[in-house]
């Protein structure tokens, strides 16, 4: 059975369970009127069904691999990621100053749920970028925000997940990476660290 995005369920949730109407009363989210919310959910749902879901099985059958020092993604993943980026979904909750839509994070969470249901392996890329965008918006200097946010929000650059070492796997407690202060700098002793989704384009 083909994937069907649960758009109507989220419309119900945002109307009856967690009313976005209360959020829209805030000046920051005044643009997130119900018609905008519905349009975002419907358009994201269409993309999930037509672009992302068809990539789930090919991604399982033809996983990423290393070829001559270059990681090759499953067939269609680069095009799928480009469709996500071109639709503006990566910056849905990011500030408008650097190209985001500045819509409520609840809508962002719903969108990522739809996208994960369609093809979680592809959606990890914009989902990881969302984490970096949020961290930069809240904690980075203006200079760093100007450098990174436009490229992350547009999808030109992607966020990564840097969690493990070859001997540790999912046992984060077995990591041996250390950072020790060396005067004004930090010196790291590390074995190879695995990166998740460093680039899709």
Residue ranges with predicted function:
Residues 128-129, 140-185:
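Internal maturation/activation junctions in enzymes
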Residues 1-123, 147:
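Amphipathic, small/basic residue-rich leader segments at the start of a protein or domain
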Residues 98-102, 131-135, 143-144, 167-171, ...:
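Flexible loop/turn segments at secondary-structure boundaries
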Residues 70-82, 93, 162-181, 195:
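Flexible, glycine/threonine-enriched loop-and-boundary segments that flank and lead into catalytic domains
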Residues 185-189, 201:
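Short, intrinsically disordered, charge-balanced linker/junction segments flanking boundaries
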Residues 193-199:
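Conserved small/polar residues in nucleotide/adenosyl-binding loops
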Residues 91-96, 118-134, 155-165:
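Core alpha/beta catalytic barrel or barrel-like domain that forms the active/cofactor pocket
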């Amino acid at each position: 059975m083909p994937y069907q995005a649960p758009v109507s369920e989220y419309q119900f949730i945002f109307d009856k369970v967690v009313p976005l109407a209360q959020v829209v009363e805030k000046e920051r989210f005044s643009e997130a009127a119900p018609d905008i919310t519905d349009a975002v959910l419907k358009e994201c749902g269409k993309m999930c069904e037509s672009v992302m879901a068809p990539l789930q099985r090919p991604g399982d059958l033809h996983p990423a691999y290393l070829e001559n020092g270059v990681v090759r993604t499953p067939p269609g993943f680069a095009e799928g990621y480009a469709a996500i980026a071109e639709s503006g979904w990566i910056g849905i909750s990011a500030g408008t100053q650097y190209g985001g839509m500045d819509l409520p994070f609840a809508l962002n969470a719903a969108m990522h749920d739809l996208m994960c249901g369609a093809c979680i392996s592809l959606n990890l890329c914009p989902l990881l970028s969302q984490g970096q965008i949020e961290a930069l918006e809240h904690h980075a200097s203006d200079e760093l925000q100007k450098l990174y946010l436009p490229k992350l929000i547009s999808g030109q650059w992607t966020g990564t997940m840097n969690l493990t070492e070859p001997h540790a796997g999912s046992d984060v407690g077995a990591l041996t990476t250390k950072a020790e202060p060396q005067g004004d700098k930090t010196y790291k002793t590390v074995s190879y660290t695995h990166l998740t989704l460093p680039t899709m384009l």
